């Protein structure tokens, strides 16, 4: 006698088990496997609704009851006649869709273009103003600001060109006698590099 894992006799239950195993394998003719999908090739019904025709994988229309026969006859007659009106209608739909999409694309490009440019080119346009920008904004007409970085404030003010803040340039060793010398020095510092050696070479010669 064969005993199952659960302790039940296998000989007694062998025949019903085969019957139970064979019953679900038989397909039910009333309920096909893919009847839930609208595109079922077996039956084109969705819970009592019959689909008239499908277009581009979208459900176009469906009806029930007595209207189905009339619409089926109409569809049969339209299928027999050469379908010239349908392609024309579809081409019109495609053209209108293309023009609409191009219009939307143009509008999007117009709307988002100023915001997309900084992300592509870099962060220069969205850069926060620094202290050097403030210094340049004080004298925007000066042409030297494109040559090098911002100059210290003591150089921008002509009266204080000989102040102690220029010690890092070693300019305190120079003997400035006249105001014309200060103007020349300021001009040289603005239009040349901020190296004291070149200033000394210019003044010594």
UniProtKB/Swiss-Prot annotation:
Enumerate the subcellular locations listed in this protein's record, separating them with semicolons. Answer: Cytoplasm; Cell projection, Cilium
Per the record, where are the segments of Polar residues compositional bias? 8-25
- Keywords on this record? Cell projection, Cilium, Cilium biogenesis/degradation, Cytoplasm, Inflammatory response, Protein transport, Transport
Q: Which portions of the sequence form the region Disordered?
A: 1-40
Q: What does this protein do?
A: May play a role in immune regulation through regulation of the macrophage function. May also play a role in trafficking of proteins via its interaction with unc119 family cargo adapters. May play a role in ciliary membrane localization.
* GO terms, biological process: cilium assembly; inflammatory response; negative regulation of cytokine production involved in inflammatory response; negative regulation of fibroblast migration; negative regulation of inflammatory response; protein transport
What family is it from?
A: Belongs to the UNC119-binding protein family.
Q: Which InterPro entries match?
A: UNC119-bd
By what name is this protein known? Macrophage immunometabolism regulator
Give the organism, scientific name.
Xenopus laevis (African clawed frog)
């Amino acid at each position: 006698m064969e005993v199952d894992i659960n302790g039940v006799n296998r000989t007694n239950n062998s025949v019903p088990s085969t019957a139970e195993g064979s019953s679900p394998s038989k397909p039910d003719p009333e309920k096909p496997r893919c009847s839930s999908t609208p595109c079922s090739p077996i039956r084109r019904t969705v819970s009592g609704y019959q689909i008239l025709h499908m277009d581009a994988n979208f459900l176009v229309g469906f009806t029930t009851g007595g209207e189905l026969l009339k619409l089926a006859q109409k569809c049969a007659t339209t299928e027999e006649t050469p379908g010239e009106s349908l392609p024309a209608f579809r081409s019109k739909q495609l053209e209108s869709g293309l023009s609409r999409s191009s219009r939307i694309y143009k509008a999007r490009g117009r709307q988002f273009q100023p915001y997309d440019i900084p992300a592509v080119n870099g962060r220069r346009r969205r850069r926060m103003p620094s202290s050097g920008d403030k210094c340049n904004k004080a004298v925007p007409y000066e042409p030297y600001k494109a040559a090098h970085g911002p100059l210290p404030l003591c150089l921008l003010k002509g009266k204080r060109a000989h102040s102690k803040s220029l010690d890092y340039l070693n300019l305190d060793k120079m003997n400035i006698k006249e105001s014309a010398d200060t103007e020349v020095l300021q001009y040289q510092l603005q239009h040349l590099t901020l190296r004291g050696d070149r200033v000394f070479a210019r003044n010594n010669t």
